[in-house]
A protein has these predicted regions:
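C-terminal motif of bacterial Sec signal peptides marking the signal peptidase cleavage site
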Residues: 4-7
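Bacterial signal peptide processing site
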Residues: 9-12
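Tryptophan-anchored aromatic micro-motifs
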Residues: 14-41
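Short, solvent-exposed coil/turn segments at beta-strand boundaries
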Residues: 20-27, 48-57, 130-139, 157-159
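A mature extracytoplasmic/lumenal domain signature
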Residues: 32, 55, 60-62, 143-145, ...
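Contiguous, well-ordered beta-strand patches that form the walls/edges
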Residues: 33-39, 57-132
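Short, exposed beta-strand-loop hairpins at the edges of beta-sheets
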Residues: 120, 129-152
Length: 159
């Protein structure tokens, strides 16, 4: 299984080595809303998401190893067509101008990387759109196009 994350911004946002906006914080606390009870990759009861930009990993704060996922940042142009409509709809609802939007693809443990290191369009399964605002102090994580893992996480940065 692979989930995808890409990066885009209204302005010029500097990037971390993994392609995420430099305003991304390492830990967010908040609340999780799921339209299903089938959270595939993360614990449905989570109130935390942690990012490690040096390892390109995201976790739900449970410290369960299977809930620590490696991701790859993709550009919006690299998204599979079935994800682009929902991504555009979500971007259209953004009111704050201090916003960075990016997408991540989760890489399964059994996946052999492509020669160019990119997740191909055919390998995209779950895609997560991440919206940062307030200089990265606020976050919204939305799943795109995966009927088994529909959720939204809203949170604020914590040290």
């Amino acid at each position: 299984c692979i989930a995808i994350l890409t990066a885009c911004s209204g302005g010029k946002t500097s990037k971390n080595a993994d392609g995420t906006p430099s305003t991304l914080k390492s830990r967010y606390l908040g609340y999780y809303r799921s339209d299903t009870d089938n959270a595939t990759y993360f614990d449905e009861t989570t109130n935390e998401f942690d990012f490690d930009v040096n390892k390109s990993t995201i976790s739900d704060g449970t410290e369960i190893e299977s809930h620590i996922k490696t991701y790859q940042v993709l550009s919006e142009d690299e998204l599979a067509s079935n994800f682009k409509g929902q991504a555009e709809k979500n971007k259209g609802e953004i009111k704050n101008t201090d916003t960075a939007v990016f997408y991540i693809g989760l890489i399964s443990d059994d996946r052999n990387g492509n020669k160019d290191g990119k997740i191909s369009v055919d390998e995209q399964r779950s895609v997560y759109q991440i919206i940062l605002s307030n200089n990265g102090n606020s976050i919204k994580i939305l799943s795109l196009g995966d009927d088994w893992d529909q959720f939204a996480f809203t949170g604020t940065a914590k040290d």
